[in-house]
Regions:
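Short helix-capping/linker segments at secondary-structure and domain boundaries
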Residues: 41, 106-110, 181-188, 292-302
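N-terminal Rossmann-like or analogous alpha/beta NTP/dinucleotide-binding catalytic cores
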Residues: 5, 9-12, 17-176, 330
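Short, histidine-centered active-site or binding-site loop motifs used for metal coordination
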Residues: 15-17, 48-50, 185-186, 243, ...
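Short amphipathic alpha-helical segments at helix-loop
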Residues: 53, 181, 185-188, 333, ...
């Protein structure tokens, strides 16, 4: 059962209004969404309920919601073609989350790598190890030092879990609700979020098998180039808005001259050859990816252009490319008023709510509460 405006494939994605959105968010996600608008019915959300899984300053959060919506618009997301809305404006998101919480299992969520990263816990793995060792040792009834070590690890892990917020643990279920509410066909995400879309698929299928066909099961779409733009100060880690050093990322609202300085300070690899090789030359490969995606120049062409030249020349040119991109982007950004954004979010919420409420009604009928 689909909404009448939904003849085209439905694409859903969103960005949290927390921290500074950066070049990695733009190249890895938003620029891809812009291209998807032509052939798809796109729904883009400012996921403010996801942002509050960690502490936010209320006044800053308010500003960031508007800022993210402006970034969508300045990037080329067109409210005439796409639905843009604020997650918290539609209560169906949290209602469906509760229903899906009753279908989800703790083990589904313990597997999520983002939870493991943020709490430094891989509880599933430790429990499996303890069980294996205990079974192996049970005949002799001697508890080995290995088991003792694992039990200590288990206690530390449980201590970390007790301190972590429930929202941080459960937000993949909220993400599943975001996606399933809109009969979504495709979810464009970065590699780090692909696992959460897999959970969404699992929960959708589990609900369908328990209560009958209800949800459309979406596909994951990961951009090949630029899916992961790495940190300028450390190419082994993803560019991140919560990085300790400001030299890790280029913010979309950074002054162009500041961004150029960050490029000039970016780490490089040993040797002098400007060549794309993720394993041997991760730093220069990351900079080449940024260059290629911002200019649409193929990687091979860039390699040929800088054959025999040094890192200094290459970084100088890339700094200019980034400067030009940010200057143009920020010019568009500054032209958008807060009032305009509020109106677009309000209109978007009205359109999104019709679809979300229809899905939620179907779900409530299936589980027997209406």
């Amino acid at each position: 059962m689909h909404h009448k405006n939904m003849a085209k494939p439905v694409v859903f994605s969103g960005v949290q209004p927390s921290g500074n959105l950066h070049l990695g968010n733009y190249l890895g996600a938003i620029a891809q969404w812009v291209l998807m608008q032509e052939k798809n019915q796109c729904i883009f959300c400012v996921v403010d309920y996801h942002a509050i899984t960690v502490k936010q300053e209320p006044e800053v959060l308010k500003e960031k919601i508007i800022e993210v919506a402006k970034i969508y618009l300045a990037s080329g997301i067109d409210p005439k073609k796409s639905i843009i809305f604020q997650q918290s404006d539609i209560s169906a998101h949290t209602e469906l989350t509760w229903i899906l919480n009753c279908v989800a299992r703790m083990s589904d969520l313990f597997r999520m790598t983002q939870f493991k990263d943020k709490t430094k816990v891989d509880l599933e793995k430790i429990i499996e190890e303890v069980e294996k060792r205990i079974i192996a040792q049970s005949e002799t009834l001697i508890v080995s030092s290995e088991i003792n070590k694992l039990i200590k690890e288990l206690c530390i892990s449980l201590g970390n879990i007790r301190k972590s917020g429930l929202g941080l643990f459960d937000y993949p279920v909220l993400m599943a609700s975001d996606i399933l509410l809109y009969n979504t066909d495709a979810v464009p995400v970065g590699e780090d979020q692909a696992q959460h879309v897999e959970l969404c698929r699992t929960l959708g299928r589990r609900f369908n098998s328990q209560f009958g066909e209800t949800f459309k099961i979406p596909e994951v779409v990961i951009r090949k180039e630029g899916a992961r733009i790495m940190g300028l100060d450390d190419p082994s880690k993803k560019m991140s808005k919560s990085a300790e050093s400001e030299y890790n990322y280029i913010g979309l609202t950074d002054k162009p001259e500041v961004a150029a300085k960050k490029i000039m300070k970016a780490v490089t690899d040993s040797g002098h050859e400007i060549k794309y090789d993720e394993k041997a030359k991760p730093a220069i490969s990351n900079l080449l990816t940024i260059y290629s995606l911002l200019t649409d120049e193929p990687m091979k062409k860039l390699e040929a252009k800088y054959k025999g030249k040094g890192y200094g020349d290459f970084k100088k040119d890339l700094a200019e490319v980034v400067k030009k991109f940010l200057t143009d982007f920020q010019e568009r950004y500054k032209k958008i008023s807060d009032k305009e954004v509020e109106k677009i979010l309000e209109d978007g919420a009205k359109k999104a709510e019709l679809i979300a409420n229809e899905t939620l009604k179907r779900v409530k009928e299936k589980i027997g509460i209406i």
